[in-house]
UniProtKB/Swiss-Prot annotation:
Tissue note: Expressed in roots, leaves, stems, flowers and pollen.
Coiled coil: none
UniProt name for this protein: Cation/calcium exchanger 4
GO terms, biological process: leaf senescence; monoatomic cation transport; potassium ion transport; sodium ion transport
Gene deletion effect: No visible phenotype.
Matches recorded under Pfam families: Na_Ca_ex (PF01699)
Example GO molecular function: antiporter activity
Keywords: Antiport, Ion transport, Membrane, Potassium, Potassium transport, Sodium, Sodium transport, Transmembrane, Transmembrane helix, Transport
Protein function: Membrane-localized H(+)-dependent K(+) and Na(+) transporter.
Membrane topology: Multi-pass membrane protein
Species assigned in the record: Arabidopsis thaliana
Length: 644
């Protein structure tokens, strides 16, 4: 796994520290610019705050109908410019700003045009950076990268840790964990970005284009590059697994196409859509359990004189459970054949998101740079320590808020101070988020804060009395793990909601339909982990190629079924008993068409070449993706009128 870790940014802590420091500075700039913090969406409905951010003595409720720039026609979008409320403001007039001196005055007079987000990015760009547009582009661009980093880092350092612990506590077989918790860990950024687009920002078309765009990218570009990398290695792919995965994926896309054609979804339809993955996961788990059980029965009839890993008595299915890079000649101290491992290898848990992890960074620096005797003659140890302290200081604004609210019980990163603080502040954060909902009275908010503080104080006291400074708790682990799991989801939602709001802002600045940005920028950003990890796995050869290609199809299928399925379920639940209307975007059918064509291309080319990936398959898939991106961008810019 060292080859994989080397490709990640873990071996470059100085760059990571500088990047995190720059992101922290931008964060402080946004906070400083947000002089009117009570106008952000999380607090915009406080009954004692008026539209200008000043306290209202009469405590009268102030509400304003929100409207996104992307709800109007911008280079191919299909919305109209009429508001459902009493206001008749057309936010599409931002660039012309007729009747106003500039865009800043337009936004100040029409606050409903600002996209939902903690920070008002449009006002920051057009007002604070009015005379320094280049600086505004740079700051927003770096912050976009930072949000992608935070989304992936939360998955790698918090969410996957909780999933791994949960799998061990529940004693899930590796086959079951491999089709349930593992895809959730690797696909968490896509899933929660989709949910945030549907529920948080009410921009369902961004979520749809992000998930489907990521699926096209992974199944075409990543599979294409993997095919090119292993074309000369004559690696053979399991035919049954390949056909099974692609058949389920094609059925999923057909079902999604039917839902999009109908244009509306109910809670029952959303549950049925998610249940496709439940059936798929059950089938995979049952098949693997039966296969390994039959292998065990065969092994029982053969008793080798010297059981060893990789011997002639070991079947391929048994070796699948032996960790990578384990010794070839390792004697078994027990009797009989080698026993199967009861958990997934640790490195698999953050395969697709480990590129964002800080844990790998700390481990690699410690393992590779520190000499065995613990000191150096040239004072490099002091320099490394100083660099580490500076890096940690720069990372503080991005890491401390999450550490203070996400409970972790990792051996390497255990801290009683953070543990007590996290269980104390997590309920307060949940109370804050709940009280920021629409149509919540002042009395309900006060009660919510009181309950959050009371629960947090109680949990903090219990954690302080029942934990030790030098090691994590050994009892009551499930509440700790579930707490980390839930709070990781909360942070996912917050970061993903901000990411979608920033993409909507870029759509308003450039006059581009935000769904195109979801199809490209958001999809590419969330798929970088798949690209790096799957290529690295395939370069190792052997089972790595099978794992990489399986992930290229199982991952997007999970994101489509669970990500979009849960998004539609939450959207339908919020509109219940009425049906949830899916945002109309005819371009989604073109995306589905290209995605289906790419799957059929792979389904035809691999069996024709005896299940060996070759250059023809890889070049064909990459060419198909380039045609797809060119077609979608051209149609968005109006060069292909019939496709707009």
């Amino acid at each position: 796994m060292r080859a994989v870790n080397f490709m990640y940014s873990s071996n470059n802590p100085k760059f990571r520290g500088i990047f995190n420091g720059l992101c922290a500075i931008i964060l402080f700039i946004f906070f400083f610019d947000q002089s009117d913090i009570y106008r952000n969406p999380l607090l915009k409905n406080l009954s004692f705050v008026d539209s200008s951010g000043k306290f209202n003595r009469g405590f009268s409720q102030f509400t304003v109908p929100r409207r996104h720039l992307s709800e109007v026609d911008t280079n191919g979008s299909s919305g109209n410019s009429s508001l459902s409320g009493d206001s008749t403001v057309s936010c599409s007039g931002l660039h012309e700003h007729r009747g106003y001196a500039d865009q800043c005055e337009f936004l100040k007079s029409n606050p409903i045009c600002s996209p939902d987000g903690f920070f008002d990015y449009l006002k920051f760009f057009y007002c604070s950076c009015r005379d320094f547009k280049i600086l505004g582009y740079i700051l927003l661009g770096v912050w976009l990268v930072a949000l992608f980093y935070l989304l992936g880092n939360t998955a790698a350092d918090y969410f996957c840790c909780s999933l791994e612990k949960l799998s061990k506590l529940l004693r899930l077989p590796p086959t079951v964990a491999g089709v349930t918790l593992l895809p959730l860990g690797n696909g968490a950024p896509d899933v929660f970005a989709s949910i945030a687009a549907f529920v948080g920002s009410d921009k369902g078309e961004v979520g749809l284009n992000s998930v489907l765009g990521g699926a096209v990218f992974v199944t075409c570009v990543v599979v294409g590059i993997v095919s090119l990398c292993v074309a000369d290695k004559e690696v053979k792919i399991d035919k049954k697994c390949f056909i099974r995965d692609l058949s389920f994926f094609l059925f999923t896309l057909v079902a999604l196409m039917v839902i999009l054609m109908v244009g509306k979804v109910t809670v029952g339809i959303a549950i049925a859509f998610v249940s496709i993955y439940v059936f798929y996961a059950s089938l995979v788990a049952a098949n693997e359990i039966l296969r390994k059980h039959s292998r065990r029965l065969k092994l029982d009839s053969i008793t080798p004189l010297l059981p060893m890993q990789g011997s002639v008595f070991s079947s391929p299915s048994v070796e699948e459970d032996i960790p990578m890079y384990s010794p070839l000649m390792e004697l078994d101290t027990g009797e009989g054949p080698p026993r199967l491992h009861d958990s997934l290898p640790q490195w698999m848990w953050a395969t697709n998101v480990a590129i964002y992890s800080n844990h790998f960074a700390k481990a690699n620096v410690h393992d590779e740079e520190r000499p065995p005797w613990g000191w150096t003659e040239d004072g490099a140890e002091v320099e490394s320590s100083l660099c580490s302290k500076i890096t940690s200081l720069l990372e503080t604004p991005l890491t401390v808020p999450r550490r203070l609210t996400i409970p972790l019980i990792e051996e390497d990163s255990w801290s009683k101070t953070y543990a007590v603080a996290s269980v104390s502040l997590a309920p307060v954060l949940l109370s804050f988020l709940w009280s920021s909902q629409d149509d919540t009275s002042l009395q309900a908010r006060i009660v919510a804060y009181f309950i959050g503080i009371a629960i947090g104080s109680t949990l903090g006291y219990l954690a302080f009395k029942n934990t030790e400074p030098d090691r994590p708790p050994q009892i009551y682990l499930i509440p700790w793990v579930l707490g980390g799991f839930i709070m990781s989801i909360v942070w996912f939602y917050m970061i993903a909601n901000e990411l979608v709001a920033l993409l909507v802002t870029f759509g308003g600045i450039y006059g581009i339909n935000p769904s195109i940005l979801g199809l490209t920028v958001l999809a590419w950003g969330n798929s970088m982990g798949d690209l790096v990890s799957n290529i690295a796995l395939s370069m190792n050869g052997g089972d790595g190629v099978q794992i990489a290609l399986s992930g290229c199809y199982a991952g997007p299928m999970f994101n489509t079924l669970v990500g979009l399925g849960m998004s539609m379920f939450l959207g339908a639940w919020s509109k219940s008993p009425e049906t949830y209307m899916i945002p109309e975007d005819n371009s989604l059918f073109y995306t589905l068409g290209f995605l289906i064509f790419g799957l059929i291309w792979s389904l035809v080319m691999l069996p024709r070449n005896e299940m060996r990936p070759n250059k023809v398959m890889g070049i064909g898939l990459i060419t198909l993706y380039l045609i797809f991106v060119t077609f979608r961008l051209s149609s968005a810019m109006g060069f292909i009128p019939w496709a707009s």
